[in-house]
């Protein structure tokens, strides 16, 4: 069985080479994101057979990130994750799979998997100028949130 472990800062040097091999522009493919969200989403990780494997498990929910590393090890990694799910008696599912990553899965396992897009999990992209000004209806909530933060968070001068 795969030995997943809690993500720690000390893992950064070991994990980064695998993440660097990805053609992924998602925040999910960065160590900072993996480390920062690992406590909230119960994310654990390990390096197995030339791939970085990540798992999120909360209660009965179990899901894997797309294995990171050299594509030649992808089939072995996915097979290992699938077996891990069977041993845990859970449905096999992956999260944050890009269309390009899904195409790789489809090459190895034709017709075996389906992709389901969940807009709530998408990364947000903003225009820097509009975000800096926070003008308009679209940014009204963000402007209120920022102003509220400015009221409730004392400046560094006031903290001493």
Where are these regions (language model features)?
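Amide-forming acyltransferase catalytic core, primarily the GNAT-like/NAT-type
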Residues: 1-48
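Conserved aromatic-histidine-acidic binding/catalytic patches
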Residues: 3, 69, 137
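Long, highly charged amphipathic alpha-helices
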Residues: 14, 76-80, 144
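Residues that form generic nucleotide/phosphate-binding pockets
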Residues: 18-22, 37, 80, 84, ...
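Short secondary-structure junctions
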Residues: 25-28, 43-45, 111-117, 157
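Conserved donor-binding loop and adjoining core beta-sheet/short helix segment
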Residues: 28-100
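Hydrophobic alpha-helical segments and helix pairs
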Residues: 92-150
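Conserved small/polar residues in nucleotide/adenosyl-binding loops
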Residues: 151-158
